[in-house]
Amino acid sequence: MKTVTEFQNKNILVLGIAKSGYAAATLLQKLGANVIVNDGKPLAENVLAAELQAKGMDVVCGGHPLELLERNISLVVKNPGIPYSNPILVAAKEKQIPIVTEVELAYRISEAPFVGITGSNGKTTTTMLTFEMLKEGQKHPVIAGNIGTVACEVAQDAKENEVVVTELSSFQLMGVELFQPKIAAFLNLFEAHLDYHGTKKEYGLAKANIFKNQTENDYSVINADDADVMALSAYSKGQKVLFSTTKEIEDGACIKDNALYFKAEKVVEVDDIVLPGQHNLENILAAMSIAKLLGVSNEAITAVLKRFTGVKHRLEYVTTINNRKFYNDSKATNMLATEKALSAFTQPTVLLAGGLDRGNEFDDLIPYFKNVKAIVTFGQTAPKLVRAAEKAGLETIESVDTLDEAVVKAYAHSTDGDVILLSPACASWDQFKTFEERGDIFIQAVHKLI
């Protein structure tokens, strides 16, 4: 960890605990700050808050009182999930108090360079692929962010010869000031999180913060097939490395003659890749670009792609029952992810979909229903998905209350050779704490059929 003195004796407000807030507060105390921790959950129900209080921190729970800002606060470190419309953050901005997320703290203390990966879909798969390729290439990667360990915990132990590989959400990237990844990858942009950002434009600008501090000594890995991402890459001063699944890229990554190329050099045959889905070729090209920029050999990249079958809850194969294959794609929290999941299969498919209602309709899914023989909907968005399915002309449409019921109904509507796919196209928070919990419950329900 770098020697950092900028936080010594400063009053710093950590807003929202959870894993990232707990880690940030603990780090800041270690760096000599006077830490004030604030969380909306009452102290009696807040185990992490009680632990921080036991460490001698000033802990205020049960709301976000504006009076906290009267304590000569130098910096606010916010949980990514707390919107900037929260009154205490509005007041902090008015007082010109800097507001950051813990990823910013991680960057400031890290001896190791960062690779940052963002996009609406594919972040986790690309991050894991990048990590595996760098590991195979003996580049000493450590993984942090939305997957793995909280970034500022990883950064404390990261050495100069290591690489911190981190998946970054728009929520995290809104709170960066100095964060400067050596390599920044922007995979795609799809209309999402509008309840947080308001518009797709604001959402895209938040993600483009990944480029904010890059210089000509850094690299920006850009999806050349996404017009929005290409437009936002104008914010980067780094060296742009493009990737495409649809056209040849001489100075980047592309697919040609059934092989993946980087800077006109063949890296791996498509037939050697075991990860399913056309959309995953985009993720692979992005990860391959990062790996090649960091000096990983073609042999190491090929070795990873010959064994990497995917990430849990992302088109995860579950089991086969009576020649019906079950797939868990609970991470599909928006329509684009579900479109890509449906495009990955040519077999007749029974789709399970539904979840938190964020105000959007689902007509964009209709062209992707060509192989869908039945749909079972659940959650807040069930009526909207039913409407889209009716417009698509699906004959078998059901709505149920629970995911367990949905699995039973989906199996009942399937026949020999079908795919049964959970790809909700929605966030999970109407019925589940996380998409992981939703996926685990799906898997449990599937195994009950055996």
From Swiss-Prot:
Protein name per UniProt: UDP-N-acetylmuramoylalanine--D-glutamate ligase
Pfam families assigned to the protein according to its UniProt record, in alphabetical order: Mur_ligase_C, Mur_ligase_M, MurD-like_N
Catalytic reactions of this protein: UDP-N-acetyl-alpha-D-muramoyl-L-alanine + D-glutamate + ATP = UDP-N-acetyl-alpha-D-muramoyl-L-alanyl-D-glutamate + ADP + phosphate + H(+)
Pathway(s) where this gene product acts: Cell wall biogenesis; peptidoglycan biosynthesis
Disulfide topology: none
Source species: Bacillus thuringiensis (strain Al Hakam)
Family matches, as InterPro entries: Mur-like_cat_sf (IPR036565), Mur_ligase_C (IPR004101), Mur_ligase_C_dom_sf (IPR036615), Mur_ligase_cen (IPR013221), MurD (IPR005762)
Alphabetical list of PANTHER family matching this protein: UDP-N-ACETYLMURAMOYLALANINE--D-GLUTAMATE LIGASE (PTHR43692:SF1)
Protein family according to the UniProt entry: Belongs to the MurCDEF family.
Top-level class of the enzyme under EC nomenclature: ligase
Chief place of localization: cytoplasm
One Gene Ontology cellular component: cytoplasm
Any single GO BP term: peptidoglycan biosynthetic process
HAMAP family for the chain: MurD
The keyword ATP-binding is annotated on this UniProt entry: yes
Residue sites binding ATP per the record: G119, S120, N121, G122, K123, T124, T125
Recorded superkingdom: Bacteria
E.C. numbers: 6.3.2.9
Keywords from the named record: ATP-binding, Cell cycle, Cell division, Cell shape, Cell wall biogenesis/degradation, Cytoplasm, Ligase, Nucleotide-binding, Peptidoglycan synthesis
Molecular function GO terms recorded: ATP binding; UDP-N-acetylmuramoylalanine-D-glutamate ligase activity
Location relative to the cell: Cytoplasm
NCBIfam families noted in UniProt: murD (TIGR01087)
Keyword Protease assigned: no
Annotated function: Cell wall formation. Catalyzes the addition of glutamate to the nucleotide precursor UDP-N-acetylmuramoyl-L-alanine (UMA).
